[in-house]
């Protein structure tokens, strides 16, 4: 059965819910709500990785996420830390996180692979080509899914060389990272190129820009004026689109999906699994 990672953003500037859960108690309560809705993992992050986001000092990041991870892990919940920083990863695992989710796949911090290897945690390797401020300048592909798979294979080799066992590795094709518009759909259609590498595969499409672009082309929300930007597509529509992509991913044997709206995705996955039999 496809797992569901519930997103807990303890940030000021995440594109979807920045600032809403900056208070640790609110973040913990939100995490518990996601757990009750069906999340199998809670992915806690203290630094936004949206395009153009400013970097956060690791000490500040740790102040944000460690109290939340400590409390959620103490309740027996599987927790992942969403971080680019080796020091935060190590502190989070010490606080009870079982997975390090690094969207850069070890490229952002040269100490990350050694930290993960020493921690014993599982490691989600994201496909990444550079910092968020210029990621779209790097969105140059001939065959997106094959190139993403090839670059992930390189990251796997680096992780193995650092002492991270294959059984601990999770692959994330990095939807929305250094990929523009239709390239994201190309990667999703070609997920077989990534699952063929033989590792667990995690995808994160939740509320992302390429979904907004597709929904905008389908028609504007009745309550908004045309051309008003990303906000002319409601969160509800984005969550429905996310749930649909999650259901379709079942056919590609994806191990887990990372989402904001766990309940909608839970229902979509239930239908998809019933269809598949």
Positions of PLM-derived features:
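Catalytic domains of carbohydrate-active enzymes, especially glycoside hydrolases
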Residues: 29-45, 252
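Short, basic/glycine-rich phosphate-binding loops at helix/coil junctions
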Residues: 11, 46-48
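Active-site-adjacent loop and "lid" segments of alpha/beta metabolic enzymes
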Residues: 16-30, 49-71, 77-78, 84-86, ...
């Amino acid at each position: 059965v496809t797992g569901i990672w519930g997103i807990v953003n303890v940030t000021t500037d995440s594109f979807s819910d920045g600032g809403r859960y900056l208070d640790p108690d609110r973040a913990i309560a939100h995490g518990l709500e996601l757990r009750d809705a069906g999340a199998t993992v809670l992915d806690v992050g203290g630094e936004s990785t949206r395009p153009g986001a400013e970097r956060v000092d690791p000490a500040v990041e740790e102040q944000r996420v460690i109290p939340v991870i400590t409390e959620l892990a103490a309740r027996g919940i599987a927790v992942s830390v969403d971080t680019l920083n080796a020091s935060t990863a190590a502190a989070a695992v010490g606080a009870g996180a079982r997975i390090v989710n690094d969207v850069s796949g070890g490229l952002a911090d040269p100490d990350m692979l050694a930290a993960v290897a020493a921690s014993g945690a599982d490691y989600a390797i994201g496909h990444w080509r550079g910092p968020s401020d210029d990621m779209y300048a790097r969105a140059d592909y001939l065959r997106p899914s094959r190139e993403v798979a090839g670059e992930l294979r390189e990251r796997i080799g680096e992780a193995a060389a650092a002492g991270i066992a294959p059984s601990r590795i999770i692959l994330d094709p990095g939807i929305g990272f250094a990929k523009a518009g239709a390239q994201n759909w190309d990667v999703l259609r070609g997920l077989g190129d990534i699952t063929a590498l033989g590792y667990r595969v995690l995808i994160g499409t939740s509320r992302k820009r390429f979904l907004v672009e597709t929904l905008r082309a389908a028609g504007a929300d009745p309550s908004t004026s045309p051309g008003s930007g990303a906000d002319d597509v409601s969160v509800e529509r984005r969550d429905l689109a996310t749930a649909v992509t999650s259901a379709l991913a079942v056919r590609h044997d994806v191990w887990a999906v990372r989402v904001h709206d766990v309940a909608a995705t839970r229902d979509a996955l239930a239908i998809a699994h019933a269809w598949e039999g």
